[in-house]
């Protein structure tokens, strides 16, 4: 991404941050405390209640929440906040994370939210202000001279979230569309491109090569940075990851493309159908626009059909430089909902 003169100044010098953070003041109805690693079940239950308003078709699993709180570079007691009501029930949480080892962009992510039945009472404003201060502290602790973004995502169907971010100074920067495809009516898989390409199910021995290919394939994607080994391993070790439903494209022993799949059966009742989620789709640059992504996706959809899944779901950056949206719609995917990526640039 382009580097400005401002970006050449170390973050420690260009970001103003509070020297210390205090917990928000308690009230007659609400109490605040820092997050703990053992809060995963409590926060998962809260996230499920939030999802009814924000994204009714899915919610974070307990394993995903544990992973978020237990990463080596996350300290929930310093980076997280929990709000409870007078009875001790969780009504809001926030987590601030800065992934390690950026190459061209330092990113800080703000996650969390407020139970819909407690919105409109100032909890979200208090939470977001604290998170933003913590994000600035993280940036100001870095000696890197790189562009830096503080980022958060909001669902269009819950406009109060986007309005809250805008009030804090965030701008709507990018749109991500959720697409669905009826597996039974999907177009058949096309042939793999010429050049000795073979498409195989994901296997453990391919894992590191797929991670490297992922980083190469996503190098020119908006907001993307290389995924480290810890993050990658956490992803493929989640119970929802499905190696037999994921596909890898190889030329000799080189990974040139991939599609990863996840299945969370807990989401099926709320969706009204069985589904697989396509998490990552990528081809390394020399193999783009040769039909490889379509062939990989077709192979994955065939695997979904054999597994008895009714629909495939994925999310796509609507302005992706790879033309991914056109690839998906050509296969029979149709848009359903949309999320907005908000950011503040430092």
Predicted regions and their residues:
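Flexible, substrate/cofactor-facing loop regions flanked by secondary structure
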Residues: 61, 185-276
């Amino acid at each position: 991404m382009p580097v400005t003169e401002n970006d050449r100044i170390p973050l420690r010098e260009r970001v103003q941050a509070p020297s210390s953070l205090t917990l928000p003041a308690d009230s007659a109805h609400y109490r605040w405390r820092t997050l703990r690693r053992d809060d995963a079940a409590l926060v998962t239950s809260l996230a499920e209640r939030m999802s009814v308003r924000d994204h009714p078709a899915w919610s974070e699993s307990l394993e995903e929440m544990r992973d978020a709180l237990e990463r080596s570079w996350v300290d929930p007691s310093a980076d997280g906040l929990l709000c409870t009501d007078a009875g001790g029930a969780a009504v809001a949480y926030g987590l601030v994370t800065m992934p390690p080892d950026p190459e061209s962009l330092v990113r800080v992510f703000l996650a969390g939210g407020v139970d819909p039945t407690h919105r409109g009472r100032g909890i979200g404003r208090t939470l977001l202000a604290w998170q933003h201060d913590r994000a600035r502290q993280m940036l100001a602790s870095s000696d890197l001279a790189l562009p830096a973004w503080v980022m958060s995502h909001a669902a269009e169907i819950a406009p109060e979230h986007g309005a809250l971010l805008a009030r804090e100074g965030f701008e709507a920067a990018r749109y991500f569309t959720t697409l669905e495809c009826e597996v039974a009516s999907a177009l058949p898989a096309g042939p793999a491109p010429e050049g000795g390409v073979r498409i195989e199910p994901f296997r453990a021995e391919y894992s590191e090569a797929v991670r490297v290919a992922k980083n190469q394939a996503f190098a020119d994607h908006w907001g993307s940075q290389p995924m480290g080994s810890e993050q990658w391993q956490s992803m493929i070790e989640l119970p929802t990851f499905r190696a037999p439903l994921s596909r890898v494209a190889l030329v000799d022993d080189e990974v040139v493309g991939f599609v990863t799949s996840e299945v969370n059966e807990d989401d099926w009742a709320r969706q009204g159908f069985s589904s697989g989620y396509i998490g990552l789709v990528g081809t390394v640059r020399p193999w783009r626009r040769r039909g490889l992504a379509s062939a990989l996706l077709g192979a994955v959809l065939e695997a979904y059909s054999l597994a008895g899944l009714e629909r495939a779901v994925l999310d796509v950056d609507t302005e992706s430089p790879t033309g991914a949206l056109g690839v998906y719609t050509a296969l029979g995917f149709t848009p359903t909902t949309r999320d907005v990526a908000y950011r503040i640039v430092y």
